[in-house]
From Swiss-Prot:
InterPro entries per the UniProt record, alphabetical: Alpha/beta_knot_MTases, RlmH-like, tRNA_m1G_MTases_N
Compartment(s): Cytoplasm
Main location: cytoplasm
Source organism (scientific name): Brucella abortus (strain 2308)
Main enzyme class: transferase
Any one annotated GO CC term: cytoplasm
Assembly information from the UniProt record: Homodimer.
Recorded catalytic activity of this chain's protein: pseudouridine(1915) in 23S rRNA + S-adenosyl-L-methionine = N(3)-methylpseudouridine(1915) in 23S rRNA + S-adenosyl-L-homocysteine + H(+)
GO MF annotation list: rRNA (pseudouridine-N3-)-methyltransferase activity
Pfam families per record: SPOUT_MTase (PF02590)
Keywords, alphabetical: Cytoplasm, Methyltransferase, rRNA processing, S-adenosyl-L-methionine, Transferase
Enzyme Commission (EC) number: 2.1.1.177
Function recorded in the entry: Specifically methylates the pseudouridine at position 1915 (m3Psi1915) in 23S rRNA.
Primary gene name: rlmH
Entry protein name: Ribosomal RNA large subunit methyltransferase H
Lineage summary: Bacteria, Pseudomonadati, Pseudomonadota, Alphaproteobacteria, Hyphomicrobiales
Amino acid sequence: MRVSVFAVGRMKSGPERELVERYFDRFAKAGPPLGLEFAGVSEIPESRGQTAQLRKAEEAQRIHEALDNAKSGGTSSGGAALILLDERGKTLGSEAFAAIVGRMRDDGKRQLIVAIGGPDGHDPALRSRADLVLALGELTWPHQIARILIAEQLYRAATILAGHPYHRS
């Protein structure tokens, strides 16, 4: 299963970007034996729409397009799965998150898209299409830190699925 991260906004050079790249590199190396291929990060420009509703709709359109491209030609069990990061989402532990990623892979999903929304959050239509709306705890995180956290959790999920001792429960 190809795993992509879609993030609204750019991450500038600096220590945060280096840390994100380090964890995504680890995930890219740990994933293939488990059937998880890291396909990279797609940065979506922040919308300049006049209202929050318009901005969310414009940002969601690009994620919809990626999902449609992944699902074209697929069956209901194939295609793409979507996880949205949202402070109002479900809070999971690392082992539960790893189990969900593993189940999506085992169910024959060809692609997993993890989407980090813009400052206004996600469009309601996109939220309703998501397979999982996930909160990274009850705190609100800047987008740069959310990227670091999901990069680390994807790597951790791969190590959990592999039985590697990185994760100590």
